[in-house]
């Protein structure tokens, strides 16, 4: 049985009941069942970068089409097949013609909870699958990786013992950061670029590892969101996985971050006005809060 996903602008669905001996006709029937797009109007793409499949031979098998388990099929409605004829283009039409809008990098907002980093990374590496329930699984995955290599993930790297860290990261009230991004970059074998809206800087995890794929996140000081490429054609699903040679994606991500900085859409964690809820002492920034916690053991802080 093949494990296939079908991705449209409406979201991602599982395609069930198919094997490598299933025909193109059976594939189209399954796609029609989950998308509502009839077989003759389907445009199906697969791979990276996505390439259109030749669906003309309905009896060809999925094995012949090199479709394999784990593939995500990008499906669009081919509206050109709906048109019986194309009207001639007049000179007036040409004079009034405007160039189509270009694909652009946009933010896909996820909930501002303690797991926004994990939700964001899962969204981009899975090709636009939004699943808040993934956070628990990803936390456990990170804990298992860290526990399996105590020499690499020692006190100096983690800021706490290996065992303490593994218990800490499994908790739903803890935040992920650079350590977790680095681990997930290695696990998913892709470069993860984090664009900081305060400094308009890109931190590139896995940059020197020779990966061919890249995903993008944007960070405002306390919250992560995934970035995706939006296309002018509303039937074209967003792109979340890029080639590491796609410098245009990085340029547009920087422009997006700079625009957010100009609008002051960031949180300077070093200037937070905080109060210790145990002794009511006023503090400024996360460094002061961290020092106070070490000195007193107080760990409950509120923003003023």
Swiss-Prot record:
The name under which this protein is listed is Ubiquitin thioesterase OTU1
Task: Return the EC number.
Answer: 3.4.19.12
Q: Spell out the subcellular localization from the entry.
A: Cytoplasm
The segment annotated Variable-loop runs over: 169-179
Q: Which InterPro entries match?
A: OTU1_Ubl, OTU_dom, Papain-like_cys_pep_sf, Ubiquitin-like_domsf, Znf_C2H2_type
Reaction catalysed by this chain?
Answer: Thiol-dependent hydrolysis of ester, thioester, amide, peptide and isopeptide bonds formed by the C-terminal Gly of ubiquitin (a 76-residue protein attached to proteins as an intracellular targeting signal)
Asked if the keyword Protease belongs to this entry, the reply reads yes
């Amino acid at each position: 049985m093949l494990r296939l996903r079908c991705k449209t602008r409406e979201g991602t669905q599982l395609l069930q009941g198919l094997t490598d001996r299933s025909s193109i006709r059976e594939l189209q029937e399954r796609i029609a069942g989950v998308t509502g797009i009839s077989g003759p109007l389907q445009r199906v793409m697969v791979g990276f970068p996505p390439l259109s499949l030749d669906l003309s031979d309905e009896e060809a098998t999925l094995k012949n089409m090199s479709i394999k388990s784990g593939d995500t099929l990008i499906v669009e409605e081919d509206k050109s097949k709906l048109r019986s004829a194309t009207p001639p283009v007049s000179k007036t039409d040409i004079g009034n013609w405007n160039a189509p809008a270009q694909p652009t990098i946009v933010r896909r907002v996820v909930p501002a909870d303690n797991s926004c980093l994990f939700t964001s990374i899962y969204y981009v590496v899975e090709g636009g699958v939004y699943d808040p329930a993934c956070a628990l699984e990803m936390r456990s995955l990170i804990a298992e990786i860290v526990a399996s290599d105590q020499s690499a993930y020692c006190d100096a790297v983690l800021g706490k013992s290996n065992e303490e860290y593994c218990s800490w990261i499994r908790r739903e009230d803890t935040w992920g950061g650079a350590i977790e991004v680095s681990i997930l970059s290695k696990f998913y074998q892709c470069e993860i670029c984090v664009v900081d809206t305060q400094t308009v800087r890109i931190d590139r995890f896995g940059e020197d590892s020779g990966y061919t794929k890249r995903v993008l996140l944007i960070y405002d000081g306390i919250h992560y969101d995934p970035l995706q490429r939006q296309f002018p054609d509303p039937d074209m699903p967003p792109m979340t996985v890029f080639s590491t040679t796609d410098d245009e994606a990085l340029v547009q991500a920087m422009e997006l971050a700079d625009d957010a900085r100009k609008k002051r859409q960031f949180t300077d964690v070093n200037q937070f006005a905080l109060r210790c809820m145990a002794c009511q002492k006023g503090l400024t920034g996360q460094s002061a809060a961290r020092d106070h916690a070490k000195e007193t053991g107080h760990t409950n802080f509120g923003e003023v």
